[in-house]
Amino acid sequence: MTYKLTVTTLALTAITSTVAATHAKPDTEHPHIVLILCDDMGFSDLSCYGGEIHTPNIDYLAEQGIRFSQFKNTGRSCPSRAALLTGHYQHEAEMGWMTAVDEHRPGYRGQISDHLPTLAEVLRDQGYATYMSGKWHVTLDAAFETPNGSYPVQRGFDKYYGCLHGGGSYYKPDPVYHNLQRITEFPDDYYYTTAITDSAVSFIKQHPTQTPMFMYIAHYAPHLPLQAPQDKIDA
């Protein structure tokens, strides 16, 4: 199965009017950065790129931020994520394939190389507070809950909420982590897309004033399975 990843927008502005009211903008040399990634969505699905689906909020972000006209897509999700997070070709990042297994040969180690810094590590060294909410999918499945894992908080992110691989379900994804703590219980009305967004908003609200922020939001949607919130199904 071929996977498509779409970088929705890279917004180099204050995040929302609510955040702007409570957190002053950092200096112009260190702008806030919000990177939003959607899984299995073609770029032309968005109205700001000519799509037929009306996406006014995303269009606003695109208008106020930066729109990519070119991006290397490997045709598989994990290698594309590794390229995005490191700025290197996927084989240089040791992510030539998926995360299921370490093939013990160059370019196919199943997770981002320790020898390459991630975008979060680079920005944190420049004084940024770094946050991630959503799908990681660039560490070995066998490394979950082991000391040699390559989790977001081990690769430059100060705070993390989300699923380390695809997730499999919007109602009860697995494995979900808050930083390095695994979450196993979910409320009855849990919905993964909403949880990712709520977590990102929470990180922003807790963000200290005058500190530049890098926020990486990696949604699982609209990746299969097609599961809507229960209240939408019942409506």
Regions found by a protein language model. Name each.
Residues 1-2, 214:
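Universal eukaryotic N-terminal targeting presequences
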Residues 2-19:
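Gram-negative bacterial Sec-dependent N-terminal signal peptides
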Residues 14-235:
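Formylglycine-dependent sulfatase
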